[in-house]
Design a protein with these regions (language model features):
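C-terminal His-loop and adjacent cap/lid subdomain of alpha/beta-hydrolase
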Residues: 2-630
Length: 630
Protein backbone atom coordinates (compact mmCIF):
# COMPACT_ATOMS: atom_id res chain seq x y z
CA UNK A 1 0.00 0.00 0.00
CA UNK A 2 1.53 3.32 -1.11
CA UNK A 3 -0.06 5.44 1.65
CA UNK A 4 2.17 5.21 4.69
CA UNK A 5 0.66 7.83 6.97
CA UNK A 6 -1.88 10.58 7.42
CA UNK A 7 -1.95 13.78 9.46
CA UNK A 8 -5.43 15.03 10.39
CA UNK A 9 -5.30 18.81 10.79
CA UNK A 10 -8.98 19.53 11.28
CA UNK A 11 -12.16 17.49 11.72
CA UNK A 12 -15.51 19.29 11.94
CA UNK A 13 -19.20 18.90 11.19
CA UNK A 14 -19.86 19.85 7.59
CA UNK A 15 -22.36 22.62 6.96
CA UNK A 16 -23.31 22.88 10.65
CA UNK A 17 -24.40 19.24 10.80
CA UNK A 18 -26.98 19.35 8.00
CA UNK A 19 -28.55 15.98 7.24
CA UNK A 20 -28.45 14.72 3.65
CA UNK A 21 -31.03 12.27 2.31
CA UNK A 22 -30.74 8.80 3.82
CA UNK A 23 -27.09 9.37 4.69
CA UNK A 24 -27.43 11.85 7.53
CA UNK A 25 -24.80 14.41 8.51
CA UNK A 26 -21.38 14.71 6.91
CA UNK A 27 -18.03 15.58 8.42
CA UNK A 28 -15.16 17.50 6.88
CA UNK A 29 -11.62 16.27 7.43
CA UNK A 30 -8.61 18.35 6.37
CA UNK A 31 -5.18 16.78 6.38
CA UNK A 32 -2.01 15.66 4.67
CA UNK A 33 -1.49 12.16 3.34
CA UNK A 34 2.03 10.73 3.04
CA UNK A 35 2.90 8.36 0.23
CA UNK A 36 5.76 5.90 -0.01
CA UNK A 37 6.22 4.21 -3.39
CA UNK A 38 8.65 1.51 -4.43
CA UNK A 39 10.65 2.70 -7.46
CA UNK A 40 11.34 -0.94 -8.33
CA UNK A 41 7.66 -1.89 -8.44
CA UNK A 42 6.53 -2.40 -12.04
CA UNK A 43 3.41 -0.34 -11.35
CA UNK A 44 5.67 2.72 -11.02
CA UNK A 45 8.03 1.99 -13.90
CA UNK A 46 6.54 4.58 -16.26
CA UNK A 47 7.21 7.52 -13.93
CA UNK A 48 10.06 9.66 -15.28
CA UNK A 49 13.07 10.11 -12.94
CA UNK A 50 11.52 8.14 -10.05
CA UNK A 51 14.65 5.97 -9.98
CA UNK A 52 16.71 9.09 -9.20
CA UNK A 53 14.80 10.04 -6.05
CA UNK A 54 16.20 9.47 -2.55
CA UNK A 55 14.64 6.51 -0.71
CA UNK A 56 14.07 5.87 2.99
CA UNK A 57 15.30 2.87 4.97
CA UNK A 58 12.49 0.78 3.47
CA UNK A 59 13.51 1.65 -0.07
CA UNK A 60 10.51 3.93 -0.62
CA UNK A 61 10.31 7.30 -2.35
CA UNK A 62 8.23 9.61 -0.16
CA UNK A 63 5.98 12.56 -0.98
CA UNK A 64 2.80 14.07 0.43
CA UNK A 65 -0.45 15.75 -0.61
CA UNK A 66 -3.04 18.00 0.98
CA UNK A 67 -6.59 16.68 1.09
CA UNK A 68 -10.10 17.69 2.10
CA UNK A 69 -12.52 14.83 2.74
CA UNK A 70 -16.32 15.04 2.98
CA UNK A 71 -17.93 11.81 4.14
CA UNK A 72 -21.04 10.62 6.01
CA UNK A 73 -20.23 10.68 9.72
CA UNK A 74 -22.84 8.14 10.87
CA UNK A 75 -23.51 5.90 7.86
CA UNK A 76 -21.66 3.96 5.19
CA UNK A 77 -20.92 5.95 2.02
CA UNK A 78 -22.33 4.71 -1.26
CA UNK A 79 -19.21 5.31 -3.33
CA UNK A 80 -16.02 7.38 -3.59
CA UNK A 81 -15.54 10.40 -5.84
CA UNK A 82 -11.98 11.72 -6.09
CA UNK A 83 -11.92 15.40 -6.99
CA UNK A 84 -8.58 16.07 -8.68
CA UNK A 85 -8.30 19.75 -7.90
CA UNK A 86 -7.73 22.29 -10.66
CA UNK A 87 -4.65 24.40 -9.93
CA UNK A 88 -5.28 23.80 -6.25
CA UNK A 89 -9.00 24.63 -6.37
CA UNK A 90 -11.67 22.19 -5.22
CA UNK A 91 -14.22 21.72 -8.01
CA UNK A 92 -16.37 18.58 -7.73
CA UNK A 93 -18.88 19.83 -5.16
CA UNK A 94 -19.52 23.15 -6.92
CA UNK A 95 -19.75 21.46 -10.32
CA UNK A 96 -22.19 18.72 -9.34
CA UNK A 97 -24.07 20.43 -6.51
CA UNK A 98 -24.80 23.53 -8.60
CA UNK A 99 -23.42 26.02 -6.10
CA UNK A 100 -22.70 29.47 -7.49
CA UNK A 101 -19.83 29.18 -10.00
CA UNK A 102 -16.72 31.11 -9.03
CA UNK A 103 -13.11 31.17 -10.16
CA UNK A 104 -12.00 32.64 -6.83
CA UNK A 105 -10.48 29.92 -4.61
CA UNK A 106 -11.94 29.53 -1.14
CA UNK A 107 -11.37 27.30 1.87
CA UNK A 108 -15.14 27.10 2.33
CA UNK A 109 -17.23 24.53 0.47
CA UNK A 110 -20.70 25.65 -0.57
CA UNK A 111 -22.92 22.52 -0.44
CA UNK A 112 -25.24 23.85 -3.13
CA UNK A 113 -28.35 21.69 -3.37
CA UNK A 114 -26.59 18.64 -1.90
CA UNK A 115 -26.74 16.50 -5.06
CA UNK A 116 -23.66 14.42 -4.15
CA UNK A 117 -24.40 14.24 -0.43
CA UNK A 118 -28.01 13.17 -0.87
CA UNK A 119 -26.63 10.23 -2.85
CA UNK A 120 -24.06 9.27 -0.22
CA UNK A 121 -20.83 10.07 -2.05
CA UNK A 122 -17.62 10.33 -0.11
CA UNK A 123 -15.79 13.18 -1.85
CA UNK A 124 -12.07 13.73 -1.42
CA UNK A 125 -10.29 16.70 -2.98
CA UNK A 126 -6.60 15.90 -3.39
CA UNK A 127 -3.69 18.27 -3.97
CA UNK A 128 -1.34 16.98 -6.62
CA UNK A 129 0.30 20.06 -8.19
CA UNK A 130 3.72 20.76 -6.73
CA UNK A 131 4.10 24.35 -8.00
CA UNK A 132 0.91 25.64 -6.35
CA UNK A 133 1.44 28.07 -3.48
CA UNK A 134 -0.41 26.06 -0.84
CA UNK A 135 -2.95 27.74 1.43
CA UNK A 136 -6.26 27.08 3.17
CA UNK A 137 -7.91 27.59 -0.22
CA UNK A 138 -5.36 25.93 -2.52
CA UNK A 139 -4.36 22.28 -2.15
CA UNK A 140 -0.92 21.17 -3.30
CA UNK A 141 1.77 18.59 -2.70
CA UNK A 142 5.39 18.17 -1.62
CA UNK A 143 7.03 16.12 -4.41
CA UNK A 144 10.19 14.01 -4.36
CA UNK A 145 13.37 15.59 -5.74
CA UNK A 146 15.58 14.33 -8.55
CA UNK A 147 19.20 13.61 -7.55
CA UNK A 148 21.65 11.98 -9.96
CA UNK A 149 25.05 10.94 -8.55
CA UNK A 150 24.91 13.72 -5.97
CA UNK A 151 25.10 16.42 -8.64
CA UNK A 152 22.76 19.31 -9.33
CA UNK A 153 20.48 18.32 -12.20
CA UNK A 154 20.12 20.98 -14.87
CA UNK A 155 18.13 21.19 -18.07
CA UNK A 156 16.31 23.43 -20.50
CA UNK A 157 12.94 24.92 -19.65
CA UNK A 158 10.43 27.13 -21.45
CA UNK A 159 8.04 29.63 -19.89
CA UNK A 160 5.28 31.34 -21.83
CA UNK A 161 4.17 34.92 -21.11
CA UNK A 162 0.77 36.08 -22.38
CA UNK A 163 0.12 39.65 -21.20
CA UNK A 164 -3.35 41.19 -21.45
CA UNK A 165 -1.93 44.62 -20.67
CA UNK A 166 1.48 46.19 -21.13
CA UNK A 167 3.92 45.08 -18.42
CA UNK A 168 7.68 45.28 -17.96
CA UNK A 169 8.22 42.46 -15.45
CA UNK A 170 6.86 38.92 -15.54
CA UNK A 171 7.22 35.93 -13.23
CA UNK A 172 9.28 33.11 -14.74
CA UNK A 173 6.41 30.64 -14.35
CA UNK A 174 3.16 29.58 -15.90
CA UNK A 175 0.43 31.81 -14.48
CA UNK A 176 1.28 32.64 -10.85
CA UNK A 177 2.79 29.33 -9.77
CA UNK A 178 6.19 28.57 -8.26
CA UNK A 179 8.89 29.12 -10.87
CA UNK A 180 11.85 27.00 -11.84
CA UNK A 181 14.52 29.72 -11.37
CA UNK A 182 17.19 30.26 -13.99
CA UNK A 183 20.63 28.97 -13.03
CA UNK A 184 22.14 32.35 -13.96
CA UNK A 185 20.91 35.90 -14.45
CA UNK A 186 23.29 36.11 -17.42
CA UNK A 187 20.95 35.71 -20.39
CA UNK A 188 23.59 35.14 -23.09
CA UNK A 189 22.74 31.42 -23.29
CA UNK A 190 18.99 31.98 -22.98
CA UNK A 191 16.55 33.02 -25.68
CA UNK A 192 13.34 35.01 -25.77
CA UNK A 193 10.94 34.65 -28.67
CA UNK A 194 7.74 36.45 -29.58
CA UNK A 195 4.94 35.49 -31.93
CA UNK A 196 1.86 37.42 -32.99
CA UNK A 197 -0.63 34.55 -32.78
CA UNK A 198 -0.88 30.96 -31.56
CA UNK A 199 0.54 29.30 -34.64
CA UNK A 200 2.57 32.26 -35.84
CA UNK A 201 6.30 32.27 -36.58
CA UNK A 202 8.74 32.85 -33.73
CA UNK A 203 10.95 35.95 -33.81
CA UNK A 204 13.91 36.03 -31.43
CA UNK A 205 14.28 39.15 -29.29
CA UNK A 206 17.94 40.25 -28.91
CA UNK A 207 19.32 39.55 -25.44
CA UNK A 208 20.22 43.24 -25.06
CA UNK A 209 16.50 44.08 -24.92
CA UNK A 210 15.59 41.89 -21.92
CA UNK A 211 17.10 40.44 -18.75
CA UNK A 212 16.48 38.11 -15.83
CA UNK A 213 15.42 40.85 -13.45
CA UNK A 214 12.49 42.64 -11.87
CA UNK A 215 11.59 46.25 -11.25
CA UNK A 216 10.97 47.40 -7.68
CA UNK A 217 10.14 51.04 -7.01
CA UNK A 218 11.62 52.03 -10.35
CA UNK A 219 14.88 50.16 -9.77
CA UNK A 220 15.74 47.14 -11.95
CA UNK A 221 17.54 44.41 -10.00
CA UNK A 222 18.76 40.99 -11.24
CA UNK A 223 16.45 38.15 -10.24
CA UNK A 224 16.43 34.44 -11.06
CA UNK A 225 12.63 34.16 -10.93
CA UNK A 226 11.59 37.07 -13.17
CA UNK A 227 12.16 38.48 -16.65
CA UNK A 228 12.24 42.18 -17.45
CA UNK A 229 11.97 44.13 -20.70
CA UNK A 230 12.31 47.91 -20.71
CA UNK A 231 10.16 48.35 -23.83
CA UNK A 232 7.45 46.21 -22.23
CA UNK A 233 5.66 42.98 -23.00
CA UNK A 234 2.83 43.95 -25.34
CA UNK A 235 -0.77 42.80 -24.78
CA UNK A 236 -1.98 40.08 -27.11
CA UNK A 237 1.49 38.90 -28.06
CA UNK A 238 2.93 35.55 -26.97
CA UNK A 239 6.43 35.46 -25.51
CA UNK A 240 8.54 32.37 -24.81
CA UNK A 241 11.65 32.32 -22.62
CA UNK A 242 14.01 29.37 -23.07
CA UNK A 243 16.60 29.04 -20.30
CA UNK A 244 18.56 26.64 -18.12
CA UNK A 245 16.82 25.57 -14.91
CA UNK A 246 17.94 23.25 -12.11
CA UNK A 247 16.72 20.96 -9.33
CA UNK A 248 13.70 19.32 -10.99
CA UNK A 249 11.15 17.31 -9.06
CA UNK A 250 9.62 13.97 -10.03
CA UNK A 251 6.67 15.44 -11.89
CA UNK A 252 5.01 12.05 -12.39
CA UNK A 253 4.53 11.73 -8.65
CA UNK A 254 1.40 13.77 -9.34
CA UNK A 255 -0.03 10.81 -11.23
CA UNK A 256 0.89 8.45 -8.40
CA UNK A 257 -0.86 10.67 -5.84
CA UNK A 258 -4.04 10.45 -7.92
CA UNK A 259 -3.74 6.67 -8.12
CA UNK A 260 -2.85 6.03 -4.51
CA UNK A 261 -5.36 8.38 -2.86
CA UNK A 262 -8.10 6.42 -4.64
CA UNK A 263 -6.63 3.06 -3.70
CA UNK A 264 -6.17 4.17 -0.08
CA UNK A 265 -9.83 5.02 0.46
CA UNK A 266 -11.31 2.35 -1.79
CA UNK A 267 -9.52 -0.45 0.02
CA UNK A 268 -9.48 1.20 3.49
CA UNK A 269 -5.72 1.43 3.84
CA UNK A 270 -3.42 2.73 6.58
CA UNK A 271 -5.20 5.21 8.89
CA UNK A 272 -8.04 5.68 6.40
CA UNK A 273 -10.67 8.08 7.77
CA UNK A 274 -13.25 6.05 5.84
CA UNK A 275 -13.27 2.92 7.99
CA UNK A 276 -15.47 0.86 5.68
CA UNK A 277 -14.05 0.09 2.22
CA UNK A 278 -16.14 1.49 -0.62
CA UNK A 279 -16.93 -0.83 -3.47
CA UNK A 280 -16.72 1.71 -6.28
CA UNK A 281 -14.31 4.58 -6.89
CA UNK A 282 -14.62 7.35 -9.49
CA UNK A 283 -12.22 10.09 -10.56
CA UNK A 284 -13.29 13.52 -11.77
CA UNK A 285 -11.01 16.07 -13.40
CA UNK A 286 -11.82 19.35 -15.09
CA UNK A 287 -9.76 21.02 -17.82
CA UNK A 288 -6.16 20.71 -16.60
CA UNK A 289 -7.04 17.68 -14.47
CA UNK A 290 -9.25 16.19 -17.16
CA UNK A 291 -6.10 16.14 -19.27
CA UNK A 292 -4.27 14.65 -16.29
CA UNK A 293 -6.78 11.78 -16.24
CA UNK A 294 -6.17 11.20 -19.95
CA UNK A 295 -2.44 11.12 -19.18
CA UNK A 296 -3.09 8.75 -16.26
CA UNK A 297 -4.86 6.28 -18.55
CA UNK A 298 -2.25 6.70 -21.29
CA UNK A 299 0.42 5.79 -18.73
CA UNK A 300 -1.49 2.67 -17.66
CA UNK A 301 -1.58 3.64 -13.98
CA UNK A 302 -5.01 2.37 -12.95
CA UNK A 303 -3.55 -0.62 -11.10
CA UNK A 304 -1.97 0.07 -7.71
CA UNK A 305 1.26 -1.48 -6.43
CA UNK A 306 -0.70 -4.56 -5.37
CA UNK A 307 -2.18 -4.99 -8.86
CA UNK A 308 -5.69 -3.89 -7.84
CA UNK A 309 -7.87 -1.73 -10.05
CA UNK A 310 -8.25 1.73 -8.54
CA UNK A 311 -10.92 3.64 -10.46
CA UNK A 312 -14.00 1.91 -11.81
CA UNK A 313 -15.13 5.01 -13.68
CA UNK A 314 -13.37 8.15 -14.88
CA UNK A 315 -14.94 11.44 -15.95
CA UNK A 316 -12.48 13.81 -17.69
CA UNK A 317 -14.36 17.07 -18.27
CA UNK A 318 -13.32 19.73 -20.85
CA UNK A 319 -10.02 17.93 -21.51
CA UNK A 320 -10.36 17.96 -25.30
CA UNK A 321 -8.01 15.62 -27.13
CA UNK A 322 -4.78 16.38 -25.30
CA UNK A 323 -2.72 15.32 -22.31
CA UNK A 324 -0.33 17.59 -20.42
CA UNK A 325 2.90 18.45 -18.63
CA UNK A 326 2.58 15.75 -16.01
CA UNK A 327 5.45 13.30 -16.43
CA UNK A 328 8.69 14.76 -17.74
CA UNK A 329 11.70 16.60 -16.39
CA UNK A 330 11.01 20.27 -15.55
CA UNK A 331 7.31 19.82 -16.27
CA UNK A 332 4.97 22.73 -15.51
CA UNK A 333 1.57 21.17 -14.75
CA UNK A 334 -0.39 24.34 -15.56
CA UNK A 335 1.23 24.77 -18.96
CA UNK A 336 -1.13 23.76 -21.75
CA UNK A 337 -0.79 26.14 -24.70
CA UNK A 338 2.85 25.89 -25.75
CA UNK A 339 3.64 22.80 -27.88
CA UNK A 340 5.31 20.09 -25.84
CA UNK A 341 4.64 16.72 -24.23
CA UNK A 342 0.94 17.51 -23.76
CA UNK A 343 0.48 18.01 -27.51
CA UNK A 344 1.90 14.63 -28.51
CA UNK A 345 0.03 11.93 -30.42
CA UNK A 346 -2.06 9.82 -29.68
CA UNK A 347 -5.30 11.74 -29.19
CA UNK A 348 -7.98 9.07 -29.56
CA UNK A 349 -8.76 6.11 -27.31
CA UNK A 350 -8.81 3.69 -30.22
CA UNK A 351 -5.58 3.18 -32.15
CA UNK A 352 -5.34 5.35 -35.24
CA UNK A 353 -2.44 5.93 -37.63
CA UNK A 354 -0.37 9.07 -37.32
CA UNK A 355 0.15 10.43 -40.87
CA UNK A 356 3.50 11.89 -39.78
CA UNK A 357 5.26 8.61 -39.26
CA UNK A 358 4.52 7.44 -35.73
CA UNK A 359 3.02 3.98 -35.36
CA UNK A 360 -0.69 3.37 -34.91
CA UNK A 361 -1.45 3.98 -31.25
CA UNK A 362 -4.39 4.68 -28.94
CA UNK A 363 -4.66 6.47 -25.62
CA UNK A 364 -5.86 3.39 -23.72
CA UNK A 365 -3.48 0.82 -25.24
CA UNK A 366 -1.21 0.34 -22.22
CA UNK A 367 -4.08 0.14 -19.73
CA UNK A 368 -5.82 -2.46 -21.90
CA UNK A 369 -2.72 -4.62 -21.93
CA UNK A 370 -2.15 -4.33 -18.18
CA UNK A 371 -5.81 -4.63 -17.19
CA UNK A 372 -7.85 -2.42 -14.90
CA UNK A 373 -9.46 -0.44 -17.72
CA UNK A 374 -12.22 1.77 -16.27
CA UNK A 375 -15.41 3.00 -17.85
CA UNK A 376 -14.79 6.49 -19.25
CA UNK A 377 -17.17 9.33 -20.07
CA UNK A 378 -15.65 12.40 -21.71
CA UNK A 379 -17.55 15.68 -21.68
CA UNK A 380 -16.46 18.73 -23.66
CA UNK A 381 -17.77 22.18 -24.46
CA UNK A 382 -17.54 23.97 -27.78
CA UNK A 383 -14.41 25.77 -26.55
CA UNK A 384 -12.27 22.60 -26.68
CA UNK A 385 -13.23 22.13 -30.32
CA UNK A 386 -12.47 25.75 -31.19
CA UNK A 387 -9.00 25.52 -29.67
CA UNK A 388 -8.28 22.84 -32.26
CA UNK A 389 -7.90 19.55 -30.40
CA UNK A 390 -11.20 17.99 -29.25
CA UNK A 391 -12.12 16.58 -32.67
CA UNK A 392 -8.80 14.70 -32.78
CA UNK A 393 -10.26 12.33 -30.17
CA UNK A 394 -12.87 11.00 -32.60
CA UNK A 395 -11.93 11.93 -36.20
CA UNK A 396 -8.93 10.31 -37.87
CA UNK A 397 -5.76 12.33 -38.30
CA UNK A 398 -6.15 12.68 -42.05
CA UNK A 399 -9.57 14.23 -41.44
CA UNK A 400 -11.34 11.75 -43.71
CA UNK A 401 -13.56 9.63 -41.46
CA UNK A 402 -15.01 9.28 -37.96
CA UNK A 403 -13.49 7.00 -35.34
CA UNK A 404 -15.62 4.67 -33.25
CA UNK A 405 -15.27 4.87 -29.49
CA UNK A 406 -14.20 1.76 -27.56
CA UNK A 407 -16.94 -0.15 -25.74
CA UNK A 408 -15.82 1.31 -22.39
CA UNK A 409 -16.02 4.94 -23.59
CA UNK A 410 -18.63 7.60 -24.29
CA UNK A 411 -18.05 11.20 -25.36
CA UNK A 412 -20.41 14.16 -25.33
CA UNK A 413 -20.24 17.70 -26.67
CA UNK A 414 -22.32 20.17 -24.68
CA UNK A 415 -23.58 22.20 -27.64
CA UNK A 416 -22.95 25.92 -27.75
CA UNK A 417 -21.14 26.16 -24.40
CA UNK A 418 -17.89 27.64 -23.16
CA UNK A 419 -15.15 26.11 -21.03
CA UNK A 420 -16.70 26.99 -17.66
CA UNK A 421 -20.40 27.34 -16.77
CA UNK A 422 -21.77 30.83 -16.33
CA UNK A 423 -24.93 32.31 -14.93
CA UNK A 424 -27.29 35.22 -15.44
CA UNK A 425 -27.08 38.15 -15.55
CA UNK A 426 -24.68 38.09 -18.48
CA UNK A 427 -21.19 39.40 -17.80
CA UNK A 428 -18.55 40.97 -20.01
CA UNK A 429 -15.52 40.66 -17.80
CA UNK A 430 -12.08 39.11 -17.88
CA UNK A 431 -11.41 35.54 -18.97
CA UNK A 432 -9.12 33.08 -17.16
CA UNK A 433 -5.97 34.79 -18.47
CA UNK A 434 -7.20 38.31 -17.69
CA UNK A 435 -8.07 39.16 -21.30
CA UNK A 436 -11.36 40.83 -22.18
CA UNK A 437 -13.83 39.44 -24.70
CA UNK A 438 -15.44 41.60 -27.37
CA UNK A 439 -18.93 40.30 -26.58
CA UNK A 440 -20.80 39.34 -23.42
CA UNK A 441 -19.82 35.90 -22.17
CA UNK A 442 -21.76 32.71 -22.84
CA UNK A 443 -24.54 32.36 -20.24
CA UNK A 444 -25.32 28.63 -20.48
CA UNK A 445 -24.95 26.67 -17.25
CA UNK A 446 -24.32 23.15 -18.54
CA UNK A 447 -23.94 21.49 -15.13
CA UNK A 448 -27.26 19.59 -15.38
CA UNK A 449 -25.65 17.72 -18.30
CA UNK A 450 -22.54 17.05 -16.23
CA UNK A 451 -24.70 15.60 -13.46
CA UNK A 452 -26.31 13.25 -15.97
CA UNK A 453 -22.89 12.14 -17.19
CA UNK A 454 -21.89 11.20 -13.63
CA UNK A 455 -25.19 9.39 -12.99
CA UNK A 456 -24.78 7.48 -16.26
CA UNK A 457 -21.22 6.55 -15.36
CA UNK A 458 -22.34 5.21 -11.98
CA UNK A 459 -25.22 3.23 -13.51
CA UNK A 460 -22.85 1.80 -16.11
CA UNK A 461 -20.28 0.68 -13.54
CA UNK A 462 -22.57 -0.50 -10.77
CA UNK A 463 -25.59 -1.88 -12.64
CA UNK A 464 -24.32 -2.50 -16.15
CA UNK A 465 -26.73 0.02 -17.66
CA UNK A 466 -25.35 1.30 -20.95
CA UNK A 467 -25.13 5.11 -21.15
CA UNK A 468 -26.80 6.91 -24.05
CA UNK A 469 -24.84 7.02 -27.28
CA UNK A 470 -21.98 9.45 -27.77
CA UNK A 471 -22.95 12.86 -29.14
CA UNK A 472 -20.11 14.57 -30.99
CA UNK A 473 -19.63 16.31 -34.35
CA UNK A 474 -19.33 13.69 -37.09
CA UNK A 475 -18.27 13.70 -40.72
CA UNK A 476 -20.70 10.99 -41.80
CA UNK A 477 -23.78 13.04 -40.89
CA UNK A 478 -22.22 16.45 -41.77
CA UNK A 479 -22.54 17.73 -38.19
CA UNK A 480 -18.75 18.29 -38.20
CA UNK A 481 -17.56 21.34 -40.08
CA UNK A 482 -14.49 23.46 -40.65
CA UNK A 483 -13.84 26.66 -38.74
CA UNK A 484 -13.86 28.62 -42.01
CA UNK A 485 -17.34 27.38 -42.97
CA UNK A 486 -18.84 28.17 -39.58
CA UNK A 487 -17.35 31.66 -39.40
CA UNK A 488 -18.71 32.39 -42.87
CA UNK A 489 -22.24 31.75 -41.59
CA UNK A 490 -21.61 34.16 -38.73
CA UNK A 491 -20.40 36.81 -41.14
CA UNK A 492 -23.36 36.39 -43.48
CA UNK A 493 -26.26 35.66 -41.09
CA UNK A 494 -25.46 36.78 -37.56
CA UNK A 495 -23.63 40.05 -38.05
CA UNK A 496 -20.90 39.45 -35.46
CA UNK A 497 -17.23 40.26 -35.83
CA UNK A 498 -15.39 37.00 -36.38
CA UNK A 499 -11.78 36.04 -35.63
CA UNK A 500 -9.22 35.33 -38.31
CA UNK A 501 -9.24 31.52 -38.74
CA UNK A 502 -5.58 31.55 -39.80
CA UNK A 503 -4.65 32.94 -36.36
CA UNK A 504 -6.51 30.34 -34.30
CA UNK A 505 -5.18 27.42 -32.32
CA UNK A 506 -4.21 24.18 -34.00
CA UNK A 507 -2.23 21.08 -33.09
CA UNK A 508 0.81 20.12 -35.11
CA UNK A 509 3.17 17.20 -35.33
CA UNK A 510 6.05 17.98 -33.00
CA UNK A 511 9.57 16.67 -32.48
CA UNK A 512 10.76 17.11 -28.92
CA UNK A 513 14.13 15.48 -29.37
CA UNK A 514 15.97 12.16 -29.11
CA UNK A 515 15.47 11.87 -25.34
CA UNK A 516 11.67 11.94 -25.43
CA UNK A 517 11.47 8.47 -23.87
CA UNK A 518 13.48 9.78 -20.89
CA UNK A 519 11.13 12.71 -20.41
CA UNK A 520 13.70 15.23 -21.63
CA UNK A 521 13.08 17.74 -24.41
CA UNK A 522 14.63 20.74 -26.12
CA UNK A 523 12.93 24.09 -26.64
CA UNK A 524 11.31 25.41 -28.61
CA UNK A 525 10.13 22.08 -29.98
CA UNK A 526 10.26 21.52 -33.74
CA UNK A 527 6.81 21.78 -35.29
CA UNK A 528 5.75 20.03 -38.47
CA UNK A 529 2.53 19.29 -40.30
CA UNK A 530 -0.88 20.35 -39.05
CA UNK A 531 -3.53 17.97 -37.77
CA UNK A 532 -7.10 18.64 -38.96
CA UNK A 533 -9.49 20.79 -36.90
CA UNK A 534 -13.23 20.27 -36.85
CA UNK A 535 -16.00 21.99 -34.92
CA UNK A 536 -19.75 21.51 -34.82
CA UNK A 537 -21.67 22.75 -37.82
CA UNK A 538 -24.19 25.48 -37.03
CA UNK A 539 -27.69 26.40 -38.15
CA UNK A 540 -28.73 29.72 -39.68
CA UNK A 541 -28.78 31.30 -36.21
CA UNK A 542 -25.19 30.26 -35.52
CA UNK A 543 -26.18 27.64 -32.94
CA UNK A 544 -24.48 24.27 -33.01
CA UNK A 545 -26.23 21.24 -34.47
CA UNK A 546 -23.99 18.52 -32.97
CA UNK A 547 -23.83 17.35 -29.38
CA UNK A 548 -26.34 17.50 -26.54
CA UNK A 549 -28.53 20.55 -26.98
CA UNK A 550 -29.91 22.09 -23.82
CA UNK A 551 -33.12 24.13 -24.22
CA UNK A 552 -30.87 27.20 -24.52
CA UNK A 553 -29.89 25.80 -27.94
CA UNK A 554 -32.97 23.82 -29.02
CA UNK A 555 -35.42 26.58 -28.01
CA UNK A 556 -33.10 29.57 -28.34
CA UNK A 557 -33.37 33.20 -27.36
CA UNK A 558 -29.98 33.94 -28.87
CA UNK A 559 -26.80 32.60 -30.40
CA UNK A 560 -24.36 30.79 -28.10
CA UNK A 561 -20.77 29.93 -29.03
CA UNK A 562 -17.58 28.49 -27.57
CA UNK A 563 -15.49 31.36 -28.97
CA UNK A 564 -15.34 35.12 -28.42
CA UNK A 565 -13.03 37.60 -30.20
CA UNK A 566 -10.56 39.46 -28.03
CA UNK A 567 -11.43 43.01 -27.10
CA UNK A 568 -9.01 45.40 -28.87
CA UNK A 569 -7.96 46.80 -25.48
CA UNK A 570 -6.24 43.49 -24.64
CA UNK A 571 -4.48 43.20 -28.00
CA UNK A 572 -4.77 40.74 -30.89
CA UNK A 573 -8.40 41.61 -31.82
CA UNK A 574 -8.39 39.09 -34.69
CA UNK A 575 -7.89 36.21 -32.26
CA UNK A 576 -10.17 34.60 -29.69
CA UNK A 577 -10.00 34.91 -25.93
CA UNK A 578 -8.96 31.65 -24.29
CA UNK A 579 -11.74 29.30 -23.13
CA UNK A 580 -14.55 31.86 -23.38
CA UNK A 581 -17.65 31.91 -25.57
CA UNK A 582 -20.37 34.46 -26.22
CA UNK A 583 -24.13 34.82 -26.05
CA UNK A 584 -25.70 37.26 -28.49
CA UNK A 585 -29.44 37.60 -28.04
CA UNK A 586 -31.95 37.69 -30.87
CA UNK A 587 -33.86 40.92 -31.47
CA UNK A 588 -36.87 40.98 -29.18
CA UNK A 589 -39.23 42.28 -31.87
CA UNK A 590 -39.27 42.36 -35.66
CA UNK A 591 -38.78 46.13 -35.71
CA UNK A 592 -35.83 46.02 -33.31
CA UNK A 593 -32.84 47.90 -34.72
CA UNK A 594 -30.22 45.26 -35.47
CA UNK A 595 -26.65 45.27 -36.78
CA UNK A 596 -25.97 44.93 -40.49
CA UNK A 597 -26.11 41.35 -41.75
CA UNK A 598 -28.08 40.09 -38.74
CA UNK A 599 -30.70 37.96 -40.49
CA UNK A 600 -31.87 36.08 -37.41
CA UNK A 601 -35.59 36.09 -36.62
CA UNK A 602 -36.79 38.07 -33.64
CA UNK A 603 -38.27 36.37 -30.58
CA UNK A 604 -41.73 37.61 -31.58
CA UNK A 605 -41.36 35.82 -34.91
CA UNK A 606 -40.25 32.60 -33.22
CA UNK A 607 -42.70 32.33 -30.34
CA UNK A 608 -46.32 33.46 -30.18
CA UNK A 609 -46.13 34.03 -26.43
CA UNK A 610 -44.04 33.48 -23.34
CA UNK A 611 -46.38 30.59 -22.51
CA UNK A 612 -45.60 28.84 -25.81
CA UNK A 613 -41.89 29.40 -25.29
CA UNK A 614 -41.93 27.89 -21.79
CA UNK A 615 -43.95 24.90 -23.01
CA UNK A 616 -41.32 24.26 -25.68
CA UNK A 617 -38.54 24.54 -23.11
CA UNK A 618 -40.31 22.04 -20.85
CA UNK A 619 -40.82 19.62 -23.73
CA UNK A 620 -37.17 19.88 -24.74
CA UNK A 621 -35.95 19.31 -21.17
CA UNK A 622 -38.22 16.30 -20.63
CA UNK A 623 -36.97 14.76 -23.87
CA UNK A 624 -33.37 15.09 -22.66
CA UNK A 625 -34.29 13.52 -19.32
CA UNK A 626 -35.95 10.60 -21.09
CA UNK A 627 -32.81 10.14 -23.19
CA UNK A 628 -30.70 10.27 -19.98
CA UNK A 629 -28.65 13.26 -21.16
CA UNK A 630 -30.11 15.64 -18.56
Amino acid sequence: MAVIGVEIRDRVEFNSGSSWGNFGPYERIDGIVEFGVDPKNQANSRIVDLQYSPVDKNGLVKFSSDFVLLTPSKSKPSRLLVDIVNRGRKRAVSDFNMSSPSLIPSANIDPGDGFLFNRGYTVISVGWQYDVYRSDALLGMEPPKVEIDGKIVKGMNLVEIRPYEKIKTSLLANRSHKPYPTTSTDNLTAQMYVREWEDGPHREIPCEEWSFAKEINGIVIPDCEHVYMESGFQPGKIYSVVYEASNPVVSGSTLLSVRDIGSWLKYSGVDSPVKVPVKYAYAYGISQTGRLLRHYLYSGLNLDESGRQVYDGVLPHVAGGRRGDFNHRFAQPSQQSSPGFGHLYPFSDKPTKDPYGRKSEGLQDTQKILGGLPKVIYTNTSAEYWRGDASLSHINLEGTHDLDFPKNTRSYLFSGTQHVPRELPQKKDAGPDGSLGLYGFNVIDFRPLLRAALCNLVAWVERGEEPPESKVPRLDDTTASTIHAVLEIFSENVGLKTPDPSQMWRIREIDIGPEESKGITYYPVREGGEYPRFVSAVDADGNEVAGIKMPDISVPLGTHTGWNPRDPSTGAPNQIISMVGLTNYFPSTEVFVRPDRDLRKSNDERYSSKKEYLEMVTKSAKKLVKQKYL
